[in-house]
Amino acid sequence: MSATIVNTTDENFQADVLDAETPVLVDFWAGWCAPCKAIAPVLEELSNEYAGKVKIVKVDVTSCEDTAVKYNIRNIPALLMFKDGEVVAQQVGAAPRSKLAAFIDQNI
């Protein structure tokens, strides 16, 4: 996994996401989710490409149920973009690299 992608927990979500100084793309995922696994390498590439501009954080919905419930995550993968501790955009489902890059560009 890229050094710029952070795996967070319910306990660390505040510090890793809500208190972050840069925009944060949060990937809600699960190990059993094939589409989640499909976009993982793309997110790694994007984390390197957008280093310093966007922080990418992964939330495993099976171990971080409180956070998943708080943000009403019903389908995965779900990508939420946070700015200043608030959700500013959401992308649900797997998407090609070009669409994910455009999602980031439109929301940073």
From Swiss-Prot:
Listed name of the protein: Thioredoxin C-2
Intrachain S-S bonds: C33-C36
SUPFAM superfamilies found in the cross-reference section: Thioredoxin-like
Bilayer-spanning residue ranges: none
One term under GO cellular component: cytosol
Domain Thioredoxin, chain residue ranges per copy: 2-108
Record GO biological process: cell redox homeostasis
Family statement drawn from the similarity comment of this UniProt entry: Belongs to the thioredoxin family.
Role description: Participates in various redox reactions through the reversible oxidation of its active center dithiol to a disulfide and catalyzes dithiol-disulfide exchange reactions.
InterPro entries to which the protein is assigned, alphabetical: Thioredoxin (IPR005746), Thioredoxin-like_sf (IPR036249), Thioredoxin_CS (IPR017937), Thioredoxin_domain (IPR013766)
An example molecular function term from Gene Ontology annotations: protein-disulfide reductase activity
Keyword set, alphabetical order: Disulfide bond, Electron transport, Redox-active center, Transport
